[in-house]
């Protein structure tokens, strides 16, 4: 028997442990370790582990309450593409900040640069770097690829978007 050591990547950042509110809940089949898994500091490694939130038919729209006003200059959302499992990277990710949780200001829109037909399992961090600003709330919108692309076995059927961690620095 050839046993391999277990590895897991943890990250500490300003949103670890913060509450997450979704406009559309993740799929019941892909809830990771619960609704706040997006801010638990645990990074996903593959499509078959419990660290990914899965969405299809709806964009991933998540707002995070940092608890207090914090100075931030970087936000990142980790996403997965696994072609054979109908999981595709979002077409773009929008990052917004707010002091009151009601009025949000866009700080960046990051476009996907990975081809939709990439067969290899790909983990991509959509990262926004911007001038330091004070914020208590962070909102992220990952725009889901609406359907599996032409030539894919699931062509025209709903595609999945998977995300593992929303990092705030």
Language-model region placement:
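Short, compositionally stereotyped local motifs that mark structural "simplifiers"
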Residues: 1-47
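Residues that form or immediately flank small-molecule/cofactor binding pockets and catalytic motifs
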Residues: 25, 100, 112
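Solvent-exposed serine/threonine-rich low-complexity stretches and specific carbohydrate-binding patches
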Residues: 106-116
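Amphipathic alpha-helical interaction segments
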Residues: 18, 30-32, 38-39, 60, ...
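Aromatic, loop-rich ligand-recognition surfaces of beta-strand-rich domains
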Residues: 44-108, 122-169
């Amino acid at each position: 028997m050839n046993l391999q050591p277990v590895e897991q990547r943890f990250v500490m950042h300003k949103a670890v442990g913060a509450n997450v509110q979704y406009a559309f809940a993740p799929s019941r089949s892909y809830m990771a370790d619960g609704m706040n898994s997006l801010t638990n500091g645990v990074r996903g490694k593959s499509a078959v582990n419990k660290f990914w939130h899965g969405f299809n038919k709806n964009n991933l729209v998540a707002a995070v309450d940092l608890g207090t006003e914090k100075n931030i200059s970087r936000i990142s959302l980790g996403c997965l593409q696994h072609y054979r499992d109908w999981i595709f990277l979002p077409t773009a990710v929008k990052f917004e900040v707010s002091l009151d949780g009601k009025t949000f200001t866009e700080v960046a829109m990051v476009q996907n640069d990975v081809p939709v037909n990439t067969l290899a399992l790909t983990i991509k961090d959509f990262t926004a770097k911007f001038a330091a600003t004070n914020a208590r709330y962070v909102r992220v919108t990952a725009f889901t690829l609406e359907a599996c692309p032409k030539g894919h076995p699931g062509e025209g059927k709903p595609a999945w978007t998977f995300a593992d961690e929303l990092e705030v620095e």
